Amino acid sequence: FRLAKENGVGTVLDTAGQPFTREDPFFSKLTDLMENTDLVMLDLKHIDPEKHRALTGHTNENILAFARYLNEIGKPMWIRHVLVPGVTDDNENLHGIRAFLDTLSNVKKVEVLPYHTLGIYKWESLGIPYTLKDVDPPTADTVKRAEEILGCSK
């Protein structure tokens, strides 16, 4: 990233934010990285820590702490939310994410990414069970509702 910035190339970090900690050596390396990062794209899957754990195997505490850290340092951030019917599309989750985002001043954009099944073959080729194989993509109305709740702008 440093070389990119030195050569006038914009830099974007696309992350789920899971490994965040304020402990070194991670934090000092992250601080250096943030000095050379123009924008962070952060995925927020679920606002409830236990539902997030059920979905990903980890709670979201590190992710939310990372978002707060980015806000503290004034790093511009885009939030992306994968909308999975029956998993991440309920009103409680969407309104909870919106309430969290309202505590941050550095969010420049919010995007809803509708769940799709295009990558199932990757899981199958690795012999990993794909637990969402019976989930259909969200309808256009469901996506629109989520975008309205989350305050997405086109």
Positions of the model-derived regions?
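Conserved AdoMet/S-adenosylmethionine-binding subsite of the radical SAM
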Residues: F1-L113, L118
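A structural motif corresponding to the C-terminal lobe/cap of the Radical SAM core domain
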Residues: A99, K108, E124-I149
